Curated annotation (Swiss-Prot):
Pfam families: BTG. InterPro entries: Anti_prolifrtn, BTG, BTG-like_sf. This is Protein BTG1. GO terms for molecular function: enzyme binding; kinase binding; transcription coregulator activity. Keywords: Chromosomal rearrangement, Phosphoprotein, Proto-oncogene. The keyword Phosphoprotein applies. The modification Phosphoserine is found at residue 159. Interacts with CNOT7 and CNOT8. The gene is BTG1. GO terms for biological process: cell migration; cell population proliferation; negative regulation of cell growth; negative regulation of cell population proliferation; positive regulation of angiogenesis; positive regulation of endothelial cell differentiation; positive regulation of fibroblast apoptotic process; positive regulation of myoblast differentiation. PANTHER family: B-CELL TRANSLOCATION GENE, PROTEIN BTG1.
């Protein structure tokens, strides 16, 4: 099988988790119809898959992490904005529906988020790489590399985090 198709197949779960998380904000506020939500979700999945297709490295999950990061920080992430335009949501409406500060990391085998600059990092989705007898050592390496990925992104902060707690959210 061609390496790209293998990589693309591995990002389906991660993208679905990220899109579901963002869509829940729209659903919770009740300002969009179910059909609009489906269109938004499908559009965002397609946009993310296209955006990530040359920046997805299951063998090195941290590689490309900054590129794949979805960020709302008083500016709307452009991919979320494009998906919202397809259902007729204005930027102002979108800002009312989503947190003003949101970071969503979409990495191979893990999707995590932080709301607010000083919020805790929460894990939305976790998967193990397909492997044989070395699975336990692979998982240990992955945990270390996931944390270092996020630490690298947090290094540019202007204020230190009040809390840096990892917690798993199961759905």
């Amino acid at each position: 099988m061609h390496p790209f198709y293998t990589r693309a197949a591995t990002m389906i779960g991660e993208i679905a988790a990220a899109v579901s998380f963002i869509s829940k904000f729209l659903r919770t506020k009740g300002l969009t119809s179910e059909r609009q939500l489906q269109t938004f979700s499908q559009s965002l999945q397609e946009l993310l898959a296209e955006h990530y297709k040359h920046h997805w490295f299951p063998e090195k999950p941290c590689k490309g992490s900054g590129y794949r990061c979805i960020r709302i920080n008083h500016k709307m992430d452009p991919l979320i904005g494009q998906a919202a335009q397809r259902i007729g949501l204005s930027s102002q409406e979108l800002f009312r529906l989503l947190p003003s500060e949101l970071t969503l990391w979409v990495d191979p085998y893990e999707v995590s988020y932080r709301i607010g600059e000083d919020g805790s990092i929460c894990v939305l989705y976790e998967a193990s790489p397909a492997g044989g007898s070395t699975q336990n050592s692979t998982n240990v390496q992955m945990v270390d590399s996931r944390i270092s990925c996020k630490e690298e992104l947090l290094l540019g902060r202007t204020s230190p985090s009040k809390n840096y707690n990892m917690m798993t959210v199961s759905g």
